[in-house]
Amino acid sequence: RGHWMYYGNARDKLGGIGAHYQDPPPAYQITVYDPAFNPPDFLREGIMYQIFPDRFHRSKMPVAERRDRVLHSEWNEPPYFIADDRSGDNWALDFFGGDLEGIRQKLPYLKDLGITILYLNPIFQARTNHRYDTGDYMKIDPLLGNEEDFIRLCEDARQQGIRVLLDGVFSHTGEDSLYFNRYGNYPSLGAYQSKESPFYSWYHFRKHPDNYASWWGIPTLPELNKADSSYRHFIMGPAGVARRWLKAGASGWRLDVADELPMDFLRELRKAVHRESKDAVLLGEVWEDASNKIAYGQMRSYVLGDTLDSVMNYPLRDVLIRFLSHELPAQQVVRQIRSLQENYPLPFFYSLMNLLGSHDRARLHNLLVRQDYAHLPNAQRRGLEMDKHLKELATERFCKMVSLINALPGMPCMYYGDEAGMEGAADPFCRGTFPWGKEDRSTQDFVREAFRLRKSRPVLTRGFLELACEGEDTLVIHRYSKDGKDVFGQPLDDAPYTL
C-alpha cells in the first residue's frame, strides 16, 4: 500500500514555510483582491493623530446646556467614573469643554509634531462625553462648536497639510436621540414614542416600546436596522450623513464597530463616499486579522478592495506590547507580522492604521509596564500614577514602540497625549485631558524627531520589508527599495530600530 504525505500551512497557521502532514493539512490563505484597489497616498504616507475632542484643548470655558452634564472647572483633574445602574458602564456625563476651536488653535503644534491626518472621536450631538451615543448626525455637539467651526478646522488643517477623518457610528444611536427619543428631549416623534414614527423601522423592537435590540445589550444604545432602506438613504444618500460631512471638509470616515455593519452596507457606503470624493477613505475598527475575519457567521471581505481602505492594526499593536513587555519572543513577533504581510493585499498592508494608544484601552505607558490597575474597582483607579522607576521604564518602552511602528509599513497613529507622557487606566481614565504646560518634553522631542525621519525617508512608506531576529529579544527591521538605492537598516550593534 502507498503512503500519502501532505504539505500544507505551518502548524500555527500563520503561513510562511509549511509543514508535512499524514492527513490533509490546513490550507494556506490565498487573498484575491481587485487589482484596481489603491488607497489614497495620504494613508500610506500619513502620520495620524487621534483626538478625543472633549479632552484635547478648550478655547473657552464651556456653558452647560443640559442639567445632567457636569462641567469640570479644573482642566487637569482626572475624569469621574459614575456607574450607570442599568448597564454598569460609566455614565460619561462629565465634560472638560475641549472643542473644535481648541483643536484648530493647536494645529501648529500638530504640524510641528509631523501629523498629516487627524482622526476625531465622534463630534455629533449626543448625551455623553464620548458621543458614541449619537443624538443628531446632522449637528455638531454644541459643547464642541458648530458646523462653521468644523469647516474652519478642516480648511485650516488642509492648509497645513493635515486631513481630518471623522468617527462614523452607524451601528446604533443613543436612546436620547432625534431618532429614538426615549425622553422627549428632541423635537421629533421618536421610534420609542410611537410606532407611527418615521424612524420606527430603523430599530428592532421585540415588543414596543421597552423591549428592543441594543448594542451588546446596553439599553442606552439601541441597535439600528442596517437593512432598512430609509436608514440607508439617510446615511448614504446624496444629502446623507456620509456625503454631507465630506462636503464640509472631512476626508473620510473611521467606522466604529465595522463588524456590526453588513457587507452590502459597507459596499454601498464606499460607493457613496466615492461619489462625493474619489480619495475619501473608509477605515474600519477591526480587532483581528481583517483578511479572514468571520463575524455573525459571515466572512468579512474587508481587504478585497470593495469595502474598506484600511483597518486599525490591533494585532500589530498587541504583539509589540507583549514583545516590549518581555512576554513574547522576537521570533513570534516576526511570525505574526509576516502573517499579516502575507494575508493582506500590498496596498492594504501599506495603508494600515498602526495605532499606538487607544481610547478603548488603558494608556500605552501603563500597558507597557502592566500597570493598568485592572484588579482595582473603577472608582479606585482615578488619578493613580506610576512611581518614578516604572514611569522611566514605561517611557523607555514607549519610545522603542514608536521606533518600531515608525519603521514598519502603514501609518503610525499617536493617541493624543501619549507623546506627552500621559498615564491612565482603562476608560474613562485613559481619556484624561492633555497636560498643556506639563508635558514630558524629552518624549515629545523623541516623537517629533522619529516622525521627521519617517517623512524624510520614502523607503519607510514605500519600501520593501524584511524582518529578522537574533535571539528572543532582538528584532531587526530592514526596509529597502527595488533598485537598492534607498536602504534603511544598520548593523545590530548600532541600529536605531533594533531592539
Regions found by a protein language model. Name each.
Residues 48, 52-116, 123-248, 269-275, ...:
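Substrate-binding/active-site clefts of carbohydrate-active enzymes
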Residues 468-499:
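Carbohydrate-binding surface patches
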Residues 47-49, 118-120, 164-166, 253, ...:
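Hydrophobic faces of well-ordered beta-strands that scaffold small-molecule active sites
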Residues 51, 110, 120, 137, ...:
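Conserved, mostly hydrophobic/aromatic
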Residues 1-48, 58-75, 81-83:
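The feature marks proteins involved in alpha-glucan
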Residues 54, 296-297, 303, 309-310, ...:
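Aromatic/acidic polysaccharide-binding cleft in carbohydrate-active enzymes
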